[in-house]
């Protein structure tokens, strides 16, 4: 059986914690898209970790962690990450890397920074992790696939060709130092030696595992609103963030994905530029940011303060629909316990008309939030294990959100730890 854990919104929803929790019952956890541009924060018995490439189930000795073909593989970061967890007494994880994954090169990171510098005030707010240049090269067919590291003749020829192409841009557009082909080849040789013991045919590995009845967990990065097709284009990432892409980025049949757990935050947050209708500012935002997450709302990759907002029912309903949601995991509910009243965005006013349907970006830029205010519960809900033991206003908040988005909230997270979770029955669960 294959399950997917994905985000409904802009990322930062708490997918790492949910994956870490569900991984206890899984055999294999797969990263299927994205790169080291977004971090998943996990709090468990070993401590607090921010993972960028490793799957969040890496802390269980019984699991195999897979880097799928859809990932932008930064090989040094992968191995730095492995060392960072084993240095803190986490057992050495079982790692498998797809021979069809492509390699994020140092020059991708350089080009990312150069382009943001060139764009100036019109920049996209990139994490400067090299993601857009990487995927640009992948689809221009000038990327380096892991399998190519083991074909020396092909590698030498390709290094010269790629360096020539890149150097035209470096010299004439960015006016930056050129790439030395010999140094580039040496870098690729180092990468080959690092990754060689872990490389395999991942799609075949997963196919055999599913025949044996094993459970596979697909871990998504970011969320629906960062998808290049269905998100707030162009302020999006460069690989699909949808569960449907899990079949492609991991190499499994689409019909194998039986459960799609979409993670929603009890309020909204975002990193980077782009339309954010329910955004709040000033002291109100600062207080929510300070209390939020598991130690403040700051990007796990960039450390940038996240933009804050109230829960957005319009965006979340859309995000859940596009993901094909079977279950919603509703996270960081405990954070809202300080508020007397909690506004919720239930619609968008665009050119004088109210809609509950998520629009394209040009219309989204004009949208103003239509807010409904719900009563707060004014207490700490951490430690509660049963849904019925939550304060009445807290339950009403969850049930109101569920009604608005139209998808079953079956998990409620009320703390940062692996076991801070409440399971609930939903009338929407078929």
Model regions and ranges:
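Non-transmembrane, aqueous-exposed alpha-helical and coiled segments at domain scale
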Residues: 1-430
């Amino acid at each position: 059986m294959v399950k997917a854990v994905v985000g409904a919104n802009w990322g930062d929803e708490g997918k790492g914690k949910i994956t870490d929790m569900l991984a206890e019952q899984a055999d294999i956890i797969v990263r299927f898209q994205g790169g080291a541009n977004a971090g998943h924060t996990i709090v468990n018995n070993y401590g607090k970790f921010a993972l960028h490439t490793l799957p969040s189930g890496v802390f269980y000795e019984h699991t195999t962690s897979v880097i799928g073909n859809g990932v932008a593989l930064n090989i040094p970061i992968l191995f730095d990450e492995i060392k960072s967890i084993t240095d803190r007494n986490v057992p050495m994880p079982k790692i498998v890397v797809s021979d069809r994954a492509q390699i994020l090169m140092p020059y991708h990171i350089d080009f990312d920074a150069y382009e943001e510098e060139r764009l100036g005030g019109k920049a996209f707010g990139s994490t400067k992790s090299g993601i857009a240049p990487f995927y640009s090269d992948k689809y221009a067919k000038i990327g380096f696939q892991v399998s190519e590291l083991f074909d020396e003749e092909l590698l030498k020829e390709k290094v010269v060709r790629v360096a020539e192409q890149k150097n035209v841009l470096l010299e004439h557009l960015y006016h930056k130092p050129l790439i030395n082909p010999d140094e580039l080849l040496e870098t690729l040789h180092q990468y080959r030696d690092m990754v060689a013991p872990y490389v395999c045919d991942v799609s075949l590995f997963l196919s055999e595992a599913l025949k044996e009845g094993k459970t596979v967990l697909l871990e998504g990065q970011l969320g629906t609103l960062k998808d290049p097709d269905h998100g707030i284009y162009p302020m999006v990432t460069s690989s699909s963030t949808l569960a449907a892409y899990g079949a492609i980025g991991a190499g499994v049949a689409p019909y194998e994905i039986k459960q799609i757990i979409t993670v929603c935050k009890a309020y909204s947050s975002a990193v980077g530029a782009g339309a954010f209708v329910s955004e709040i500012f000033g002291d109100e935002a600062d207080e929510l940011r300070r209390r939020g997450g598991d130690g403040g709302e700051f990007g796990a990759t960039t450390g940038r303060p996240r933009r804050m907002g109230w829960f957005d029912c319009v965006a979340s309903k859309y995000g859940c629909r596009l993901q094909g949601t079977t279950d919603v995991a509703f996270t960081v509910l405990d954070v809202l316990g300080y508020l007397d009243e909690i506004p919720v965005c239930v619609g968008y006013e665009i050119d004088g008309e109210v809609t509950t349907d998520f629009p394209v970006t040009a219309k989204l830029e004009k949208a103003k939030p239509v807010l409904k205010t719900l009563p707060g519960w004014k207490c700490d809900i951490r430690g509660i294990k049963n849904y019925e033991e939550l304060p009445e206003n807290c339950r009403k908040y969850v049930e109101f959100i569920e009604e608005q988005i139209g998808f079953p909230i079956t998990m409620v997270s009320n703390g940062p730890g692996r076991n801070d979770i409440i399971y609930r029955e939903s009338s929407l669960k078929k």
